Amino acid sequence: MTVREELERQEHRRLNPKAAFADRSKGRPRFEPDREEDVRTCYQRDIDRIVHSKAFRRLMHKTQVFLQPEGDHYRTRMTHTLEVSRIASTITRALGLNEDLAEAIAMGHDLGHTPFGHAGEVALSECWGHPFRHNEQSLRVVDYLEKDGHGLNLSYEVRDGILCHTGDKYPDTLEGLIVRRSDQIAYVNHDIDDAIRAGILTNEDIPRAISDVLGHDHSQRINTLVCDIIRTSTKAGTVCLTPQVETALKDLRSFMFERVYRNPVAKGEETKARAMLQRLYEYYIAHPEALPEDFHPQLSFDGLGRTVCDYIAGMTDNYAVDKYTEIFIPSGWQVRG
């Protein structure tokens, strides 16, 4: 028996019968024969493929809510991804589900995010003329764009969880549902931290009715939400919150949209960011020869608009600014904010 087979046997001994077992995966887009020397389950291999990908490394230079904030402690897509992973791992472990699958989904769920957060999604949607959704782009990254067009060839359950971590369609696995919830828990709580750091909020601004249910600081809120999911899901046999906590979380998200996500401080640079990406899109549409050479073969398969979207979506915030400066700002000039 190989090490991998022993790990798969251990999963059957210790995990909840409702868990997604590695040896029951629906497989990969392209068949890969088992290798006797591989000591990892399919989901463990998927984690490693994602973490070693170029798209994953770029997450550290893509901002979350505040565009290019001054300071070292604001969240990026990378820190958000790690927080989602830790929350999801805690919940899956407590419920006896597959931590490896949850971690793989969490690590890959935001790989397709544009520079400048959701402002980038809006910009590309307007330019391209089609809805640009980061969850669909994340799947495109792992299926196609990574490894020079070959993709990472991830397991079905990981790909499903990445695609369905947001939007109307829900994941097929409980682990995918947990990552979807963990994403909500992570971003609403760390965005409060960043808003407090930016001077937009204080903890006292959060409505008392919400704080009395979820807690009065970052640690209390996350602990309440995680523990409530664990207790409620154990009894219900699915991933859910109690009605009281569900309502409080929904109200907290509404509060954050009103006070933070639509706040002039958070949104002040969005107009500039959208205009920057739109001008880059228009430039590459007019000058496809200026695209990097590794994107040229894609033009004949996907068309110019789709290829330009892929290129811009893969940019980090700083790279987008640098390309804009290189193309549109005369050498030696400085842009004043």
Q: At which residue positions do the language-model features occur?
A:
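A glycine- and small-aliphatic-rich helix-loop capping segment at beta-alpha/alpha-beta transitions
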Residues: 117-128
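Short active-site segment of divalent metal-dependent hydrolases/proteases
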Residues: 112-113, 186
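Short alpha-helix carrying the canonical HExxH Zn2+-binding catalytic motif
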Residues: 103-108
